[in-house]
């Protein structure tokens, strides 16, 4: 399985995970110039911008690969999404991250972290 196939499989599993917990999936793979959000999901008044990191068990913990630069790109993409889809800010944005661990092509675990990061301090990153 290629890394992109593993990533898609991980994202699909996370969508199922979110649906089982009462979320509505609003968008997958939302792209703007310079950024992408894997999953945008809503539950009540929360609009979750979800970054999915899939790795084989032998490659270490997936969220170790979520850099401050990537967080900044996600925040920028979320601001553009909100400007278009949530202009009155009726929904509260939240930045979540998910670690999907695989072994031999099978998903071993999903660790969902709400409020994994926020925009504070990211403006200093270039």
Where are these regions (language model features)?
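Residues at secondary-structure transition points
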Residues: 1, 5, 9, 34, ...
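Domain-level recognition of nuclease-like catalytic cores that cleave nucleotide substrates
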Residues: 86-126
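Acidic-basic catalytic patches of nuclease active cores, encompassing PD-(D/E)XK
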Residues: 1-28
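Catalytic cores of nucleic-acid endonucleases
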Residues: 54-103
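Short acidic/glycine-enriched loop/turn segments that link adjacent beta-strands
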Residues: 32-35, 106
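Conserved protein-kinase catalytic-loop segment immediately C-terminal to the catalytic Asp
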Residues: 38-41, 99-101
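Conserved catalytic cores of phosphodiester-cleaving nucleases, focusing on short active-site segments
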Residues: 18, 39-58, 74
């Amino acid at each position: 399985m290629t890394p992109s196939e593993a990533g898609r499989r991980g994202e699909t599993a996370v969508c199922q995970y979110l649906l089982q917990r009462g979320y509505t999936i609003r968008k997958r793979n939302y792209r703007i110039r310079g950024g992408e959000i894997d999953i945008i999901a809503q539950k009540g008044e929360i609009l979750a911008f979800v970054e999915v990191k899939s790795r084989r068990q032998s490659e270490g913990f997936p969220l170790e690969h979520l850099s401050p630069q990537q967080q900044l790109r996600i925040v920028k993409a979320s601001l553009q999404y909100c400007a278009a889809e949530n202009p009155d800010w009726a929904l509260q944005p939240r930045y979540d991250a998910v670690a999907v661990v695989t072994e031999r092509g099978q998903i071993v675990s999903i660790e969902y972290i709400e409020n994994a990061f926020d925009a504070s301090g990211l403006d200093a990153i270039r």
